[in-house]
Amino acid sequence: MQLTPNFSLAEMTFSETASRHGWDNTPGPREVQNLSRLANMLEQVRALVGKPIFVSSGYRSKRLNDALGSKDTSQHRVGCAADIKVAGMNPDQIGRAHV
């Protein structure tokens, strides 16, 4: 399922850890709605930086989140957070791209 032109649901939910352990990391309908909104925000960041964005961590099921040692209040759990990387840019540069 394509959420936006450049971000798919599969990309926003993929986890090497979940795959390696055979864990289901499928979000529910509410989380999919949140991921869609998040993907739209990431499209705006992509336009500002002028480069593709790699999502290293998006939605996390409770099992995955617990295995990673994250808190239950993590926004990843509800599809409202993503860890991203942009080739050739550090986090500060990405953050300043909107200025």
Identify the role of each PLM range.
Residues 3-98:
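Cell-envelope/glycan interface and biosynthesis
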